Amino acid sequence: YAITAGIPGTDDPTGPDEYGYFAYDSTDLGYSSTPVYEWMELDPEGGNLLGNVFLSQDDSVMTIPLPFTFRFYGVDYISVTMSTNGWISFIPTDQSDFYNCYIPAALGPYAMVAGYWDDLKGMKTGVDESGNPIFADMRIIYWYDSANNRYIIEWNKAYNQYTIDLGPAASMEKFQIILYPKQEQDGDIVIQYHTVDNPGITTNYCTVGIEDHNQLRGLTYTHANTYPVTATTLTPGLALKFTTTWPDNYVANEDETLPIPVCNLRNYPNPFNPVTTISFTAKQKG
């Protein structure tokens, strides 16, 4: 027999991937894991004197120690590499990887969280005598919120290469990746979008998602301006949460007369499958 379980929508979480990560967004109402958009400005230019600032014009990375151990895809990490191109990696790297691709794939950084993976730069302010572009500094601000035991990384004044020649009118991306460690569990990852555009028509747009240390498992929220049926288009004020916490209405039911437990679960397909087919064989005729 085959049963096709119901049609999911944008108010449902995306996933799981092969490891068990789901992506909840702030429009997934009715789930305990749904994130709430709560922007906390880190940039000292915005009045917060706590954030540390990494300045770069283009294609740079910086590796910093974490104040806690963070488990991701079952592996414990103690540092994070931040890239000007909108991602972090838990494995130190000197590669900035500006060319985004689908997740998972054997390209780009390992053990990655792509908050807004695309070719990002500081604002273009002119050209030099040789005709080379001149960029202002992009700002990456990072801070440990000890009161809430979370680590926040913010990208500010990050301009999209696709519209970079527009100068101050170019598309600016301002977003945060927030790490929440858990005791002896995979940590939660929240991404918040303060200002966001996705203009790269000919450059795969941006990629948002997570990927493991072997680049074999991952969960894409969006790539090439394509979204799973359960995802919401990136907009200002959107929050995402990547977590291994299953939806509240997941029910496992064991029956002693059956050799294998049966699980009842609302349809949570992998990113681009609109339905789930459950196949089974009855032990005897009913």
Q: What is each of the regions a protein language model found here?
A:
Residues Y1-N253:
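Extracytoplasmic Ser/Thr/Pro-rich, glycosylation-prone low-complexity segments
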Residues E254-Y268, F272-G286:
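Glycine-centered coil/turn sites that cap beta-strands in beta-rich domains
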